[in-house]
C-alpha cells in the first residue's frame, strides 16, 4: 500500500514519505487522513453556500476544524477513529446537500461511498491529485496553514470563543482548493489571506486564554519531582488541564506538564493549583525514553504523540482526548451538555501508580508573553538605547528529532552576551536550560509560551516599533531565526508575513512542499531564507 505525505519538516529524504510516515503513521492512517480532508472540503463547499443566505451549520463549523486538527502531524494515529470521522462527515455532507444545490459541484461534494471503498478512493484524493507542481505547492501551503489555524480555533472554541469570520474564511479557502482551474496568482492571494486570518485566530486564542486564566506572568517552574503519584499532561489544550486540575484537587495526585503544556505554569488561574507541581522532561520527541520513568498515566490533549515501541512499559498508561488518537490508548470522550470532561478513569489509574522518577532537577523561568514584556517596556527600551541589548533573536517554533537541530543549541550558546532570545513553542527546549544569564535583570531567554504565543512576540515587536517611532517593523533590531516542524508553524509563518515581517530564516530545512518556483516567490517578495552554520549565521545577523 502506498502513501504520500510531505507536510512536516522531517519528511523522508526531504521529499516525502511514501512507505510509512517518519512520524510513525502507517499508509492506512495517512490515506484515511487524505480522505477525511477530501470529505471536509466537500462539507466546506456546502456550508459556504449555505452561509451566503445566513443558513450555515454550526455543526459543520465544528466538524471542519476538529477534522483538520485530526490530520495535523502527530495528532491522531487511530485509523478506526479517523474512519469514524469520515463516516460522520459523509452523513453531515448529505444533510447539507439536502439544503442547498451546488452547480458544477466538485467531486468533493458528489462522492459518497461505504467503508469498503474508502481505501481505493483515498488513493486518488491526496496531495498528488494535483499534477502541476506549483499549483500543488501553493494548495498545500494553504492547506497546512488552514490546519494550523484550525488548531488555534479549536482551543479558543473550547473556552467559549468563536469568530464566524474565521469559520467563513477557512471554509472559503477549503472550497477554493477544490477548484481545478485555480491559478497561481489566485493561490498566492489566498495564501496571504490565510496569513491575515491566522493573525486573527492567534489574537482570538490569546484573548480566550488571558480572559480565562489571566495574563502570563514571570514564573519559576520546577523540573524535578515530588513523592506522590502523578499525571503527565502533554499537548496544548488549557481547558483540559484546568478541568483535570479541578478534578484532582485534594486527591493527593500531582499534575505535571510536558513539552508544549509547560506554559500552563505561567497563567495565574492555573498556577494557583498547588498540585500543579512542575514540568517533566523535554520536547515531544524524547517521550519514548522519558515516559518510561514517569510511572503514571500520560494525557495527550493534542499533538505531539510518538507511537510507543512495542515493548514500551508505558503503552497502557497513554490516554488521548479531543482530536488526538492512538490505537490501544484509552480515549477520554468530549464534553456533553455543558459539563466537564470526565477524567475519573485516568485519575483512578494514577492512584495505582508509583511516583515519577526524577530525570533532572532545578527550575526554569518563563511567562514573558506580551503583557509581561510590555510591563517591562521601560527597562527593555533603556537597555536597547544604552546598548546593553544589541539585538533580539526570535527563535520561536518547534523542536524535532533531526540531529541538525543541535544548530539551535549551538546558536544560542554562541550568541554574544548583549543579545536576547525571544521564544515560544517547543523550540525553547534546545536552550531554555542553558546558563545564558541576564542583561540588567532581563533574562536572555524570554519564553512567551506555546507555539500560538508567537503572536505575543509579534505584539512585542509592534510595541517596540511604536516606542522607537519606526515606520517599518523590519527596522527593529530583531532577527527571526525560526525552527519549524508542523502545520501550526506554517500558520505562524504566514501570519508573520501578513504582519509585514521580512527576512525570516527557517530551519533546519525549508519545507519539502515548497516547489522551486514557490520558494523563489517567497525569497523574492519576503526575503525568506534557510540556515547554514551557527558561526556563519551569527556573523551575518550581527553584521
Curated annotation (Swiss-Prot):
- Pfam families tied to this protein: Prismane (PF03063)
Question: Enzyme class, one word?
Answer: oxidoreductase
Which superkingdom? Bacteria
Annotated protein name in UniProt? Hydroxylamine reductase
Residues bound to [4Fe-4S] cluster: 5, 8, 17, 23
Please name the GO terms of the biological process aspect recorded for this protein, alphabetically: response to hydrogen peroxide
Cofactor binding, per record: Binds 1 [4Fe-4S] cluster.
Q: What is its EC number?
A: 1.7.99.1
Species of origin reads: Bacteroides fragilis (strain ATCC 25285 / DSM 2151 / CCUG 4856 / JCM 11019 / LMG 10263 / NCTC 9343 / Onslow / VPI 2553 / EN-2)
Where along the chain is hybrid [4Fe-2O-2S] cluster bound? 236, 260, 304, 398, 426, 451, 486, 488
Q: Where is it localised?
A: Cytoplasm
* SUPFAM superfamilies in the cross-refs: Prismane protein-like
The record's family statement is:
Belongs to the HCP family.
Give residues where Cysteine persulfide occurs.
398
Q: Does the keyword Calcium apply?
A: no
Listed under GO cellular component are: cytoplasm
Role: Catalyzes the reduction of hydroxylamine to form NH(3) and H(2)O.
What UniProt keywords are attached to this protein's entry? 4Fe-4S, Cytoplasm, Iron, Iron-sulfur, Metal-binding, Oxidoreductase
Indicate where this protein is primarily found.
cytoplasm
Q: Which reaction does it catalyse?
A: A + NH4(+) + H2O = hydroxylamine + AH2 + H(+)
Cofactors: [4Fe-4S] cluster; hybrid [4Fe-2O-2S] cluster
Any one GO molecular-function label of the UniProt entry: metal ion binding
